[in-house]
Amino acid sequence: MIKYKYIKTISAALISAMLITGCSADNSGSTVNDSSHGVLAGSTDTSAAAGKNTDGDSSDNSTNESSGSASNSSSSATTVSSATSIDTSDMFTNRDKEIGYDESTSVKLTLNGDSISSSSSSVAISGSTATISEEGIYIISGTLDDGMIIIDADKNAKIQLVLDNASINSSTSAAIYVCNADKVFITLAAGSENTLSNGGEYIAIDDNNIDAVIFSKDDLTLNGSGILTINAGTGHGIVSKDDLVITGGTYNITAASHGLSANDSIGIADGSFTIVSGKDGIHAENSDDEALGFAYIAGGDFDITAQGDGISAGYYLMIDNGSYNITTKGTGSDDSAKGLKAAGNLIVNDGTFTISTTDDGLHSNSDMSINGGSFTIATGDDGLHADNDLIINSGVIDITDCYEGLEGLNITVNDGTININASDDGINAAGGTDSSGFGGFGHDAFSADSDVNIYINGGTITINADGDGIDSNGNLYVTGGGIYVSGPESSADGALDYNGEATITGGTLIAAGASGMAENFGSDSTQGS
């Protein structure tokens, strides 16, 4: 039986503390684990056919799968079902990354205020509108006060637009409109500064509803090393109704709606992004196919201020690296204002994240895996929330302000450093529906009849909670790690709270909290003090 002792000098309220030390575990915070439960990795979900490669070349990217070794020697802990990551092997093609062009053989378009000039027969000019109809490379420079560039070519055509100090404003439509092509590449010329804008109105063209400064019905890639500033007083910044890929460049986007938006997928290899949006900063969603609408970010620098979500995916969201400063400001009960959000799995392998949100910091309607990275999170709701499995394999997570720190149906901590300052529970494995969440496809919802578990196999966890320190509406299993809980002074809460069984077979746990709801581990525990 585990022994514990009371401490009455922590505060004016009666406070209890449990000191449970490891006899057989490595208390350094890492754990060797021979169990597969809790690792969001392994097999590849081929239904997420990331990045349809139609460029006629092979991708030079290897498949990225989230990984993270995990171990657990506890025979009491049941296995948490694993999930899969995105196959990104053909997300970025060689052509996506190709920014070179031969100026001597390229077609030149010169913007002259209220007119456009070009000597090529593949460019039809009508007033201040130029329509490109053939495959090739087109260099655009100059200023167009009120007009647009239209791509209307063969369905197999690949067209490269080079913006070389180009400024285009359209008062009634997109500055660049891709009506028909196989794929269009927009290259920001080295050293160039380009500006695209809309004057506040979008008029349909041939029954096509256009609602972005750059609007593409087909695959769209942006690359290069120049600067692109987009101002969308109405509608979105950049939209692709197919795949949107960005492999380089500097982007300053101000949009009334989404900053970047795509139906099938968004893939970002690199770039610098400053986005101020009336809705989501980056948004991928496909209402017709649940296996589309995913987002993958390999790296880049992101500064996002959004009234909606910072980065939102209607299917999977996977981040391999990058620097992220995300602020969301939504306040409506029917709106979603999360930092990172996925309707499917949310996977973070590395990166630096500073997230300040009125809604959840990170949210998944399915499974979430944190395999690395550094996080500083201040939120009005949950720090990290998953409707199914929340798995932390590595990383430094500092949740400075939140309602609940970690929340999921099943929570597994295999390693990492986690600091939580919560106004309610520090860690909560929940059943039923949590009404604290905002709207969108991000309401907090759990299956009421599902098994609920918390597994702590390693890492260092420090919790300061006004509610329960660790609360499982099912079972609690501790096999390793260092856990330090400063629980509530309220007699209605406790440092530990569970509804099923609780066992400890390794690690160190020090818990302080009000004695009115104090609970201890069960007799099946092999740990003593």
Predicted regions and their residues:
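A composition-driven surface/loop motif
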Residues: 2-529
